């Protein structure tokens, strides 16, 4: 881990503010050839054309995720959803469609520029059951037991206090609530030089939890029915792309990264008030 996580948080904020301004002013996609660090190949081809239909182009262009948590979350009409680190709002808008007018979709983000972009995207999408909140995922500004489902898209890995994030997620979920997150996860030993690199932390790699650690931290927070399903394992060419331009010996380190990082669906459930764990309908 980098020695000063406040510096990392500040760089993360600057990166996402820059991405939001780039989209808002008509710049290229964050995920295109002029991508910011960590934007590609993690963020490519996450949503299908049917999902994108009717969404503002700016919501798609600002997407910096590593999966599609709305496809994972099995949302139902009337539910309340919270997206941790909502960025330009794409997953919040998709969730709002799924939960319908009797439901609610919250987005939480710490970056003013992303919040402004997300609210503009909400206006363009014409969705009233959406609210974007300013705050940090380590201190969620919602009451206990207020949310049915928590989603997040390649954001938890950015936090320097993941235990606190998961405890906060558990706190705001209703009994029986669901945790359905896309994140970058590791499997096997990762070189310490990569773990300490600030740019790779900001790029969603250095801060990624080991698969077993993720499960253990979720369990320690109180969750049950924990599972992690890899959706894309990054190969050596992906590793080279991640490392290029970071001041790192690409030839030496890329082979050590091969098949050790993956995008995954992370699922968990908060036990019910009686301690029972609701059956998961699918998967």
From Swiss-Prot:
It holds the Pfam family Methyltransf_31. Its EC number is 2.1.1.137. GO terms for biological process: methylation; response to arsenic-containing substance. One of its GO terms (molecular function) is arsenite methyltransferase activity. It catalyses: arsenic triglutathione + [thioredoxin]-dithiol + S-adenosyl-L-methionine + 2 H2O = methylarsonous acid + [thioredoxin]-disulfide + 3 glutathione + S-adenosyl-L-homocysteine + H(+); arsenic triglutathione + 2 [thioredoxin]-dithiol + 2 S-adenosyl-L-methionine + H2O = dimethylarsinous acid + 2 [thioredoxin]-disulfide + 3 glutathione + 2 S-adenosyl-L-homocysteine + 2 H(+); arsenic triglutathione + 3 [thioredoxin]-dithiol + 3 S-adenosyl-L-methionine = trimethylarsine + 3 [thioredoxin]-disulfide + 3 glutathione + 3 S-adenosyl-L-homocysteine + 3 H(+). The keyword Methyltransferase applies. InterPro entries: Arsenite_MeTrfase-like, Methyltranfer_dom, SAM-dependent_MTases_sf. Keywords: Arsenical resistance, Methyltransferase, S-adenosyl-L-methionine, Transferase. The keyword Transmembrane helix does not apply. Belongs to the methyltransferase superfamily. Arsenite methyltransferase family. NCBIfam families: PRK11873.1 (NF008823). Catalyzes the transfer of a methyl group from AdoMet to arsenite, producing methylated arsenicals. Involved in the conversion of As(III) to a number of di- and trimethylated species, with trimethylarsine as the end product. Reduces the arsenic toxicity in the cell and may contribute to the global arsenic cycling. This is Arsenite methyltransferase. It comes from Rhodopseudomonas palustris (strain ATCC BAA-98 / CGA009).
């Amino acid at each position: 881990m980098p020695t000063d996580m406040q510096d990392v948080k500040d760089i993360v904020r600057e990166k996402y503010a820059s991405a939001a301004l780039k989209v808002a002013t008509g710049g290229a996609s964050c995920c295109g050839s002029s991508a910011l660090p960590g934007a590609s190949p993690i963020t490519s081809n996450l949503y299908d054309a049917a999902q994108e239909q009717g969404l503002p182009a700016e919501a798609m262009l600002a997407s910096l995720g590593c999966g599609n948590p709305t496809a994972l979350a099995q949302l139902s009409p009337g539910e309340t959803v919270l997206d941790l680190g909502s960025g330009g709002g794409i997953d919040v808008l998709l969730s709002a469609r799924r939960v319908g007018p009797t439901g609610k979709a919250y987005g939480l983000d710490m970056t003013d520029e992303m919040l402004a972009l997300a609210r503009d995207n909400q206006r363009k999408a014409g969705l009233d059951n959406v609210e974007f909140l300013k705050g940090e995922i380590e201190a969620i500004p919602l009451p206990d037991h207020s949310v049915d489902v928590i989603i997040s898209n390649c954001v938890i890995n950015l936090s320097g206090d993941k235990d606190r994030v998961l405890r906060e997620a558990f706190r705001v979920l209703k009994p029986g609530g669901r945790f359905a997150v896309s994140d970058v996860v590791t499997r096997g030993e990762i070189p310490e030089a990569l773990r300490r690199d600030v740019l790779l932390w900001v790029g969603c790699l250095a801060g990624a939890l080991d698969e077993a650690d993720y499960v253990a931290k979720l369990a320690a927070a109180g969750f049950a029915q924990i599972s992690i399903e890899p959706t894309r394992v990054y190969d050596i060419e992906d590793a080279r792309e991640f490392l290029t331009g970071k001041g790192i010996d690409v030839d030496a380190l890329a082979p050590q990264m091969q098949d050790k990082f993956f995008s995954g669906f992370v699922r968990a459930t908060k036990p019910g008030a009686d301690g029972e764990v609701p059956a998961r309908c699918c998967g």
